[in-house]
A protein has these predicted regions:
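FAD-binding core/adjacent interface of flavoenzyme oxidoreductases
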Residues: 1-9, 65-153, 224-231, 240, ...
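Beta1-alpha1 glycine-rich phosphate/pyrophosphate-binding loop at the start
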Residues: 4-64, 68, 141, 151-194, ...
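Short glycine/serine/threonine-rich phosphate/pyrophosphate-binding segments
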Residues: 15-18, 119, 136-139, 162-167, ...
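General beta-strand structural signal in soluble alpha/beta enzymes
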Residues: 32-35, 78-80, 104-105, 111-113, ...
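Hydrophobic alpha-helical scaffolding
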Residues: 56-63, 237-242, 289-293
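A Rossmann-like FAD-binding core segment of flavoenzymes
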Residues: 70-73, 78-95, 171-253, 258
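FAD-site-proximal beta/loop scaffold in flavoenzymes
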Residues: 133-143, 238-289
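Internal hydrophobic alpha-helix adjacent to the cofactor/substrate pocket in enzyme cavities
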Residues: 293-300
Length: 300
């Protein structure tokens, strides 16, 4: 078992910002654990621009922003391919590392685990289980990291801002956005979001519309929706479930840390301390979802 001054779980904007600030303050024994093979968090998957202005005074694509964050944290011990399994008292963290299962201890531990979208299964959408159903994050990984085009015509379920990230990803990959589906009377993204989706991307925006079922054998062939009592099957070969973010609390909920029922993340005080004062939390783990610059600022 090894002990460090500070242990940070998550190498996204919040985790890397904290590492950079600790380095600036002269705290050298800082270790960052990241389950993916590369540091940078969700922005690595976002090939479009819109990142970095508040942090670096540059408008950057997601990968460029992630690269800048990692560069700023140069000299920090960032251990990729390492997954935290359990949080224990006194800053002990069990993790799967390239060497096997280890216990790594931090005199202080920062949880910067981020957030995730709600997938099809958690939304209780019926129908078949064909290939071609994604979250925005999965779509972006396939397009920007795997460099594949997973479908040609897609429907986006949800109209939060992240849905527009899906639209930009589709444009990059040459995927036709057929429609955007929203259950409420108006889309969630601020105006003129609906106009942009229709006019700039050519997508139908269907408000007051409920997803009924997914059709297809082997591969998606359509999405059945209901609007004003009438049902329609929208022909498509891809469905993207976007938004409805929830904190990434898979290892927090089974732990000894208290959970805030209002946010789903850990309870913190005004200093970001959890119910066990050895642990702190920052970023989108606390109340999804905020922009990357907010997570960066909280980490610092």
């Amino acid at each position: 078992m090894t002990t460090h001054d500070v242990l940070i779980l998550g190498a996204g904007p919040a985790g890397l910002a904290a590492a950079v600030e600790l380095k600036r303050l002269g705290i050298r024994d800082v270790v960052v654990l990241e389950r993916e093979q590369h540091a940078g968090g969700v922005p690595r998957h976002c090939g479009h621009a819109g990142f970095g202005w508040k942090e670096f005074r540059r408008v950057l694509t997601g990968p460029s922003y992630a690269e800048r964050m990692v560069h700023a944290a140069a000299g920090v011990d960032i251990r990729t391919g390492t997954t935290a399994l359990a949080l224990e008292a006194d800053g002990r963290v069990k993790a799967v590392t390239p060497r096997g299962i280890e216990t790594i201890t931090g005199r202080r531990v920062l949880l910067a685990l981020g957030t995730r979208e709600t997938p099809r299964s958690a939304r209780l959408v019926s129908g078949t289980r064909p290939w071609g159903v994604f979250t925005t994050g999965a779509l972006q990984q396939l397009v920007y990291l795997a460099r594949t085009t997973p479908c040609t015509r897609a429907v986006i379920v949800g109209t939060e801002l992240v849905a527009f990230s899906s639209l930009l990803t589709m444009r990059h990959a040459g995927i036709k956005p057929v429609a955007m589906i929203e259950e409420s009377d108006r889309i969630v993204a601020p105006r003129p979001g609906g106009w942009i989706a229709r006019m700039a991307f050519g997508a139908r925006v269907l408000e007051r519309t409920r997803v009924v079922a997914i059709h297809g054998a082997g591969k998606v062939s359509g999405l059945e929706v209901e609007r004003d009592g009438a049902r329609e099957v929208i022909a498509c070969d891809g469905i993207v479930f976007s938004g409805r973010f929830v904190p990434e609390t898979a290892i927090v909920r089974p732990s000894h840390l208290e959970i805030d029922p209002a946010t789903g993340g850990p309870v913190i005080d005004q200093y970001g301390r959890c119910s066990d004062p050895t642990y702190f939390a920052a970023g989108n783990l606390l109340r999804p979802v905020e922009a990357s610059w907010t997570a960066w600022g909280e980490g610092r």
